[in-house]
Amino acid sequence: MSEFDHVQFLKTLSSEPGVYCMLDSDNQVIYVGKAKHLKKRVSSYFRSNITDSKTRVLVSNICNVEVTLTNTETEALLLENNLIKKYQPRYNILLRDDKSYPYILLTNHKHPRLAFHRGSRKVKGEYFGPFPSAGAVSESLRLMQKIFPIRQCEDVYYRARSRPCLQYQLKRCSAPCVNKVSDEDYTEQVDYVRKFLTGKSHEVIADLIKKMEAASQQLNFELAAKVRDQIMLLRKMQEQQSISGNFAEMDVVGFAHLNGLNGIHLLMIRDHKVLGSKTYFPKVPKDSSEQEILTSFLGQYYLAPGATGRIAKEIILPFEIQESDVLGQALTQISERKVTLKVVTRGERAQYLQLANKNALNSITVKQSTQDSINKRYAQLKATLRLDDITRMECFDISHTMGENTVASCVVFDSQGPNTKEYRRYNVTGITGGDDYAAMEFALNKRYNKLVDEDKIPDVIFIDGGKGQLGRAEQYFATWPHAKMPLLVGVAKGTSRKPGLETLLIDGGRKTIPMDSDAPALHLIQHIRDESHRFAIAGHRNKRQKQRTQSLLEEINGVGAKRRQTLLKYLGGMQGVKAANIEQLKKVPGISPDMADKIFNHLHDKG
């Protein structure tokens, strides 16, 4: 046990509701909990007869406890989840994927647009959702585009149009930007979209049937056929999405445990339709119970800041959890409507729960199968490179066009695969164009010269290139000041540059590592190399495009940095500037009629 004097501390502890934070010797929060009676709850950790190994390990690391009193247990629950999100304590069960849920946005413009939206609701308009994933929103937008010809383009693109775009030719937009549709007809389609997104698709079909019949009576058979197609698509979508039963708004939470991995599957039902589903794999301390895992998940999922819109009126649980009444009260309070949590054993709700449980188990199986494949690749790579362990690998690549706009990339892989949060790009400057060796040295300097956290020193560094690049990397590491030295491996392409024919170089290229083309370890190296290459090329293209955009406008006398920025922002990038006619250019703030003529003539003389 630590030096923490729990006896003296407990004497001062209040019996009111509140939250407690346990800290270790580094003053880091290692556990956050809440209690209706703080003194009783915190005292329970320091009993002499604790049998739970997880609690014993936790207590052995406690060096201090901080408490915050609250008025009610509900307030304590809300504060607890905010602190868990803030500190990510290692002994708490953590929900790792806590991004805000996406919505469909219908803007309030004269000609409203449909758009994907995630985050704060600063844009004026109507928000529909939430949806379980970005893919669910994209699929819904794609389907609606086929049925309702409402624009989905950005405003800057919309304002810059002088003729219809490809979406109009595909009959997926009615081109209000160039007056191919009347305001009245466009508004009618927007009303249909609004009804459809609020679960009133039957009303939309009824309205469309009336419209089709009226068009037929007026012998407008082209319009009648167009409306008929809309009705058929709507009915097809209804069949795919509809569910039996009167479930207007319900979340079904499935749970499964297999081989040490826990999966929680969330099935979202809104407006009598299954919006979609998603499986979560919370980070769980050893020996956590199923009730603890589910309770922690529900709190972090529904009580996260900005999560009010995702709270369903009815939440179906796979089993009873402790303090479900407190959680229900908290959800009711923040959503300002009655929220019920229940366990069901019969009826259609039970069938959906069975489906959610099945999905949770299936997701675990798939994840473990994928992880097994990753583990196999890592194990073979460790054996091939003769390393005891590999917890972190980095790979560098250089991208440029004829020596210009050089960009270096560094991608990071850990035991789970790509760690995209750690990816970095470096704009290479101060070297001779096309000197890949100097560019590699520049990237290594940028990456490691100010390295403070030795835990981030990789076990292996892959250099995408031959002996020259690897040799320059070894020169850099010759004066490496840290105790841990990464293994440097060059990945040289074969003469045919085909995958599977790569040569692995070590010791400055003096030695090669033979590998079969179908070896799992080689597949892992190819994955890292390809990811580094992709990331470098993407950065290079962005830089090249930015330079092209700036250089073309920089050639125009009188168009300085401020005017360039205004033109690009107002007209939606260089494509918008090029597509604009003189009248549209004159509408840009700060652009006179003479300047508009000059810009238009210069851009079009350039072809």
From Swiss-Prot:
GO-annotated cellular components: cytoplasm; excinuclease repair complex
Q: What is the lineage of its organism?
A: Bacteria, Pseudomonadati, Pseudomonadota, Gammaproteobacteria, Alteromonadales
> What protein name does the entry list?
UvrABC system protein C
| Name of the gene encoding the protein in the UniProt record | uvrC
Has the keyword Nucleotide-binding been applied to this entry? no
Cellular compartments annotated: Cytoplasm
Keywords for this protein = Cytoplasm, DNA damage, DNA excision, DNA repair, Excision nuclease, SOS response
| Family annotation (Pfam families) | GIY-YIG, HHH_5, UVR, UvrC_RNaseH, UvrC_RNaseH_dom
Its assembly, as annotated, is: Interacts with UvrB in an incision complex.
